[in-house]
Amino acid sequence: MTNASSVVLPRAARSAAASFWMALGVALLLLWLSACAAPLAAPTAGPRTDSDQTDADRRAGVRMELAAGYFARGQFNTALDEIKQALVAKPDLREAINLRALVYAAMGEPQLADESFKRALTLYPLDPDTLHNYGWLLCQQQRWGPADAQFDLALAQASYRAPSRTLLAKGVCEARAGRLVEAERSLSKAFELDPASPAVAINYAEVLYRNQQFERARFYVRRVNAQPEQSNAQSLWLALRIERRLGDRAAVDEMSQLLRRRHPQSPELQAMDSGRFDE
């Protein structure tokens, strides 16, 4: 089986892919944070109202909303301060321990992030959000096997409401590891569950392109580029390379014009102008 070190991508594709993995990481974390900002409460037999919350619930909830906002703005130390206050109110709060791990990861402190995730999993062993986020951290550390195990555990939970998110992360991680057959399978499943997601479509198209399935890759990248609010330099560059492989000169010209007009400072345009299509 092909391993990560033997996968050779064009230089610009490597740059675009690196940027996309980073952007995807932010998107995955922010998706999870939307849950953090919700009122913090344990499941009950009926709807939870404000009157059901304890003072500790409310204090922790306010702190978590503030922490999530600071994290999204890159104010990591301030976010940590708010998380500490949330944990004073509720010492075993799952959302706070998870968010602390995400902040440490963003600060470049993988050991502290790892410790926080392990703490969360000690308290909540089969929590799918924690398993997902820990899997993503392990993927960033190129710990492919353990990352895959966390994703699979998350997907195995019957109560999990976001399987397409984890299938996307799993597929991205498999692609980074050079396991393109497995990545194609995971991303195909993600697309079946969430066909409207541009992140799923563009990653699926990228893997299909790398697997030399150019017609299929064209179909999925066109879905993204057909929506101006979804297309970006990476998706246009991928489309251009696909059309070049398929020999459609008119489509290549169209993509190059769009790339030049919409993203004049992008590394993808620089790669195109330098003729670095297949380095």
Task: Label each region the model flagged.
Residues 30-55:
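Bacterial Sec signal peptide processing site at the extreme N-terminus
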Residues 42-46, 50-51, 226-279:
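Terminal, low-structured helical/coil segments at or just beyond the last alpha-helical repeat
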Residues 55, 89, 123-124, 157-159, ...:
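Structural marker of alpha-solenoid helical repeat scaffolds
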Residues 56-89, 106:
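Alpha-helical segment of the N-proximal tetratricopeptide repeat
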Residues 72, 106-107, 140-141, 176, ...:
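Register position in tetratricopeptide repeats
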Residues 96, 130, 164-166, 200, ...:
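TPR alpha-solenoid repeat register
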